Amino acid sequence: MTRSNDQSVLFHVQHLLGIGHVRRANIVCQALSGVGFQVILVTGGSPIADLQRDGIEIVQLPPLHIGDRGFHDLRDDTNTPVDADWKVNRRDRLLDLFNAVAPDILITEAFPFGRRQMRFELIPLLEHAAARNRP
């Protein structure tokens, strides 16, 4: 079933350890695209070269993964612990993307039930989306 749709979806997924969450998010995005949604998949983990891109736009935030001390040990792509400035930069990039896309639908994978360490960007994103003028 394919239909034309003018609605857009911004789907945020953060993989920190493995890539199962981003693979499943990619499948959901493919299905949304297949029924006509304009889909932007925003990923914040290490880049994955072989994600299915047909019909969706993939936006890579500055990569983040966990260090040896567990899920509270957030590291950048050089394995350096992230600091407040790094988090502000990434949050601002995500909010800028949201403003540029102005999606009709926002999906956050796992949050607030998981990915609590991503509060620094997801709570501002949700607050920003809630404050936006809607028809």
Map each language-model feature to its residues.
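Active-site-proximal region of nucleotide-activated glycan assembly enzymes
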Residues: 120-135
